[in-house]
Structures are given as structure tokens and as C-alpha cells.
Amino acid sequence: MVKIKSLMAAAVVAGLSGTAMSQGAMAQDLTVGVSWSNFQEERWKTDEAAIKEALEAAGAAYVSTDAQSSSAKQLSDVESLIAQGVDALIILAQDSQAVIPAVQLAADNGLPVVGYDRLIDDPRAFYLTFDNVEVGRMQARAVLAEVPEGNYVMIKGSPTDPNADFLRAGQQEVLQEAVDAGKITIVGEAYTDGWLPANAQRNMEQILTAEDNAVDAVVASNDGTAGGAVAALTAQGMDGTPVSGQDADHAALNRIAQGTQTVSVWKDSRDLGREAAEIALALAGGEEMSAIEGAEEWTSASGNTLWAKFLKPVPVTAENLEVVVDAGWISKDALCQGVSAGPAPCN
């Protein structure tokens, strides 16, 4: 059934141009399966809504699973999606290596795979993400502007997610000169298992204890880990210590308005979700990865060459909070909740 539907879609796309109308025509009766790594994180709700909206607009169907932070469950989830007869897969990998058998299974069934936001280090998966090295640079730049000298802590992402190291590389690019000059000392550094805020908080607490609270800045790799770091700092009366993040989670944007987080690099997941849906449908219709608009060849650290598309992030600080309100990402009320005499638009 899967292969028959894919062949039908290919036949349709062969006779149509790459317009939105043709994309909608080719998507009739197609189903895209999405495997989420951990849908409990706030961020993925927005991604899902964008994917659903794009699929529905094209006349395609959406089904999904949640691996609940389990690599083993993600493999069985993908098996389940394939058994349901999906025509393409979008996979947010829990573990970039452990998910490879799922890509093999998809290939065995003639199904295209979009590696969503996180690298799946396999040339058979199209890699769609933001420029995560640049995200790391943006995080470090914002914190460095606030604290040009002092003791830094690096709260990294999950050790099973290549994005954690991409981010860390970008952060180090920005900080290296100050480190070499002796202006900055990195007094603590830790990965955050599963990107879980509770793990980030525990790591931050341990570093604060080891350093007798002599910490001037925290470069945290996403808003969840930032939230954990802020909780640990607040418990020690250190709220207001510069902390970075990414994803523009509503709670993080509120922390920026309150002054307890310095920056959240906004990766508009509405754009990412829409792109993922459109790419999945195009690939299901027989389009080559190389023909995807904006696609480029990219080589991973392991030496694999993949087709990838990188979207551009935006750093959000107290200086430009209006941008997320103007874009409809967050309401002014949600942004400014509990804020008095804060930055615009909360003043």
C-alpha cells in the first residue's frame, strides 16, 4: 500500500509544476507520520500545529507518535507509523545514532525521511534545521555583551543530540578570544541528559556548590536548560545573573521581560514545521532531495554528506521583545505577566 501510494504521487508530480496548487494536488490521499522524541516539551506543540496546518492545506493527513524520551520506543513508533501506511516520515530524533535502524526500515519500505531539527547522520534522511552553530554564537554574544569578564558556566544540551555540540562550538567561537585573554574562565560545564530542565537545574546546583556561588554568567543551550539554571540561581539569591537560551518558549520570553534571562534565540518553529511538511510531501511525490528549494550539500562531523536546509534564527533580548509580539508568537499579556516597569512592550 505504501509503495503504491508513493508511485501514484510520483505520477501526479511528474505532470505538475512545483506550485502550491500542484503540491496540494499531489498531496491528495497522502499521509505523513511524525515521530516526536518527547512531546511534553512546550516547544513541540507549536511545531506540530504548523505541520498539521501545512498538511491540511495540501490535502494530506497527519499521524504522530511520542517516544517519551526513549530511543527504543522511537524505533517501535516508526515501525507503527510505517504499518499504518504513511507515505513519508518526519523524525525528531531522540538519539542521532540509535534512530538509524528506523531510517533503514523506512528505506526498505520506499519512504522518504525528514530529520527534523536534530541531525540524523544518514544520507537517506533530509536534514532540516536552523543554523545551530550560529544559534550558539548568538547565545554567547548576548551573554558576553553583559559580562565581558568573569566566571562562566556552560549548560549544554543532551549528549545524544548532535545539536548540543553544534551549539557549544558556536558558543566557544565567540568566547575563545576572551578566554585566551584571561578575561573569562569557564568554571563549570555539563551536558543535560534528555535536555530536561530538572537535570540542568541539578547540574547548575552542583556547579554553584563547587564554586561557592562564584558564577557571573551562564550560557545555557536552550530555554528548558535556561529555566533549570535560573531556578538554581534564584534559590541562591542570584536571579538576574545573565543566562542564555533558545526556542523563544513563552516562559523564557517572560523571564527576559522580568530580567532573569538575557536572550532566547528564536527559531520560529512555525516556519520549521511548515517547511518539514512541504519537504515531506515533495519527497513523497518523488522529488529528489537536491531539488528541494534552498537545499544544500552538507557534511557531518562523521564525514557523511547529506542534503540539508538551514533556516535563520533571531536573537530575542530585552531590546527587541516587540518582535515576538508583532509576529503573533506570544501575546503581550503572556509576555508581560508579572512584569512591572519592564522593557517594551511591558512598560
Features from the language model and the residues they span:
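Gram-negative bacterial Sec-dependent N-terminal signal peptides
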Residues: 1-27
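A residue-level marker of the well-folded mature domains of exported/periplasmic proteins
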Residues: 3, 23-347
